[in-house]
Amino acid sequence: MHFNNRFRWGLVASLLAGLLACTNNDIDPNAGTSGATPSKGSADFSRYVAIGNSLTAGYADGGLYRESQLNSYPNILAGQFKTVGGGDFIQPLFSEAQANGSGYIKLVQVPDTANPATLLSAIKQVAPGAIRETNSQGNALFTKFSGTNQNLGVPGIKMADLLTIGYGSPAGNPYFERLLPDVDSARSTTYFQYVSNNLAGATFFSCWLGNNDALSYATTGGVTPLTASALFSTNYTAMMNKLTEGGRKGVVIGVPNVTITPYFRTITLSTINRVIKLLSPATPDLPALAIQASDAPQGARASTPTDLFLLSMILNQTELTKFGRTDVGTKVGRYAIDLTNPLPTQYVLDAGEVATLNTRVAEFNTILKTQADAKGLAYVDPNTFLSQIASANGLSQNGITYSSAFLVGGVFSMDGIHLTPAGYALVSNEIIKSINAKYGSTIPQVNPASYHRVLLQQ
């Protein structure tokens, strides 16, 4: 997912008002462990391999870069596995010279809410550091990584893509293309084959796949189809059979309910009205927006609190300037105000689409849990943890309260979907809990306070 380098200043003002500089100086850096002597239980962690998508790769802040890779949950887990006999963990890191990787976004100052002009420089796009060329579609291809790899996370990959020939070609997924040899014969390698080729000697695995089969539907307002459950099941069964060959143990993580993330919960009708006021002070508050909706008999209706406006609506700098105009959209009526000229579906996940998404995610997780149980694997339900994060009181650990709030909640990064280092540490602890419960191990947890949240950077 790519993000514009500027936010509408009115939105950022409303989001960052009250943002305080935080430190962890008052937190015990040794907190978060059980105190039990580390032991491996019935599992063997001597060679760990991680399979998954962007969350596994360490994607954050709208990009993949060296620091985000170093704070990936597999790297955090591998560090804890060393206390129970785990070995070195090799990731496909961008070099220090190309540390910016694919590029990312960062917060460079706390804006002065009394001076909106300062907000124009509050968000900065960091230029990519590892682009070697562009493909025929004009998309960036990254500097190749060669050699041993134990973090097989590929941003953007779906369960539906596991057996797709050409997925790692220059016209395919650039994050996967980066991992394959720079020879023509490698272009037909599927992700399933790549995983198979990197399992030699592996004694333990984690597998977090399936997120993008739901996420791409959600972030496009239902435009991109959901993966069919039958295909999801077929491909996942093949992957599980491969990963558990020879009795290999591991942990499976379920598909999160993405609609609790800031990407879907930050923009409300009240927020939109505040921004419109900044753009046009004479405009009265809108009681609702006119939206395209899958559950509307005529294709459009007034928005309700159960419809979710996407962060992309604000990240598109020109979108809000269209509100009320009659020369954009269908050009029949006022844009986003009259039902004859509704806000396009790609900017809203309507209530009907939310219900469809939730049903499919539940189906996906049933498939994952059934496979984990059948194979005797540890299973993590991420939604138990995320529900705590999204609750009114958030999740308190070691003196810090974490929430799902955008920028200030501590869990989600600048892109509103992927995690901060602290968020990845929290997830790592949930995975460790599940592993310990399943295999009788006593792997120590990490202290999330030792990992940073959204930072102000120069």
Segments predicted by a language model, with ranges:
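Bacterial N-terminal signal peptides that target proteins for export
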Residues: 1-10
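C-terminal motif of bacterial Sec signal peptides marking the signal peptidase cleavage site
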Residues: 18-21
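Conserved active-site regions of diverse hydrolases
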Residues: 23-458
